[in-house]
Amino acid sequence: MDSAAGGGGLTAIRLPYRHLRDAEMELVSLNGGTPRGGSPKDPDATHQQGPPAARTTTTRKLVLACMVAAGVQFGWALQLSLLTPYIQTLGIDHAMASFIWLCGPITGFVVQPCVGVWSDKCRSKYGRRRPFILAGCLMICFAVTLIGFSADLGYILGDTTEHCSTYKGSRFRAAIIFVLGFWMLDLANNTVQGPARALLADLSGPDQCNSANAIFCTWMAVGNVLGFSSGASGNWHKWFPFLMTRACCEACSNLKAAFLVAVVFLLFCMSVTLYFAEEIPLEPTDAQRLSDSAPLLNGSRDDNNASNEPRNGALPNGHTDGSNVPANSNAEDSNSNRENVEVFNDGPGAVLVNILTSMRHLPPGMYSVLLVMALTWLSWFPFFLFDTDWMGREVYHGDPNGNLSERKAYDNGVREGAFGLLLNSVVLGIGSFLVDPLCRLMGARLVWAISNFTVFICMLATAILSWISFDLYSSKLHHIIGANKTVKNSALIVFSLLGLPLSITYSVPFSVTAELTAGTGGGQGLATGVLNLAIVVPQIVVSLGAGPWDALFGGGNVPAFALASVFSLGAGVLAVLKLPKLPNSYRSAGFHGFG
């Protein structure tokens, strides 16, 4: 879900293939290549295999080159806010709705690093990153179109012929098409996200890292705001009435139109990026053992071996390339064997094996970071899955499969939830500027702990608001189905307040990891890859367990949110007691999120 949000995009949380600050996060090749940042030892080899001179991309081109981030994030915001409610209108029970999110963390963990390695070695005349960005964006367009028209396609394939305004049963053909499109969308998001970040790293000069990261995050924020605004609008069916069909009523046509707008916006952003991102094609002799984007290590043994190998020269942006230069004629003879080994090491299975086996080489203090990170995401992901559904059910007392008034109330609640996510994104953007000074003032450990305590309070507040809302509704103080104004406004405040701890979650853990591994000589990449494991495993657990857990207590979203508050409380306590104390000279490691 980048994914991510934010953020949000997982969108599984998408792990960047290369941090924009080399001093903080040194990413090493999957094959155990040399760390980036080494100086060339052979001037002749540098001249032969590296580009002739360093260059600096203008700020204008950097802004335009990473515009695709806004297009991807637009679709991710719609996915995050609308698709859990929509799948329930197709007849998938609330207890099973969370299962559709399984693909996001899996593809984020396996596909994204592999795509990063493959793009490193891509020899297309159009560059290393742009072919993957193009392919991923086209996949996104196809996937969201499939999702938007799933009800119509199901109708064509044999679902009920009864009008959607009166039919309350299941539409399994439409649901199958929806799930296929949803999983393809997760796969496509992860295909684009990494090469887009790597492209930005390729284009930015040594002194442009901070500004480049800020530009990328700004585009993500723009995409979030536009996407959640689109999801909050209930007028798409009025502006595009031809999208309403016998199988697709108001809520469906609103979603369909929003996704079609997302397609147009993404194609525009992608075209701008592809045009202004001037890549230098990779020569065949340069394609060996590049390490721009692989967040993995083979282990300390490979690091020791790699330290004795020569390194070649500068990349176009002034950074040094970590690919190895043959030191003698024997190296050339071994090229074919090495490439055969790399084909195996670049595979999805090898990615998982490398990360799992490399956990033995984690630096001291990382295990407590992983534990706190896992509990943090066990508390966050139920909210990401069911936030708008909670607003529609518990606050507005709607039902996606109820009578006409109940469905209308549910749709209104979902749109109000999307507006709450819009407010959340605004606060998240503001909070991202406050994280650095807060960490310098109080220390990263305490800031991370406070963010988890804030999530605990907010998740507990959702349970309390649900109880108050149900009590008011049951006491018949309302003669029509809908939300109490005070409860609704309080819910929007909770959505907004969660933006600040979310900005901390998207940045501080990665900076703590960078600080703990700063002197390990390449261990940063290993630790960051394992940190991603502490994100995706909780997402898989929640995807599998949240729906059945809610069903165990009679349905609704309160059980999952209440359990999330327990996890966040535990994460806060462990952060205070177990996290290593770090100096207050905090340095941001960049923005990480769903999108």
From Swiss-Prot:
One cellular component (GO) term of this entry: membrane
UniProt-annotated location(s): Cell membrane
GO molecular function, one term: sucrose:proton symporter activity
UniProt keyword Nucleotide-binding, yes or no: no
Major location category of this protein: membrane
Residues bearing glycans: N403, N484
Pathway per the UniProt entry: Glycan biosynthesis; sucrose metabolism
TM regions (residue ranges): 62-82, 98-118, 131-151, 174-194, 214-234, 257-277, 366-386, 418-438, 448-468, 492-512, 526-546, 557-577
One annotated GO biological process: sucrose metabolic process
Membrane topology (Extracellular): 83-97, 152-173, 235-256, 387-417, 469-491, 547-556
Methyltransferase keyword on record: no
Record-linked PANTHER family: SOLUTE CARRIER FAMILY 45 MEMBER 3 ISOFORM X1, SUGAR TRANSPORTER
Self-association and partners: Homodimer.
Record's function text: Responsible for the transport of sucrose into the cell, with the concomitant uptake of protons (symport system). May also transport other glucosides.
Family: Belongs to the glycoside-pentoside-hexuronide (GPH) cation symporter transporter (TC 2.A.2.4) family.
Protein name as it appears in the record: Sucrose transport protein SUT4
UniProt source species: Oryza sativa subsp. japonica
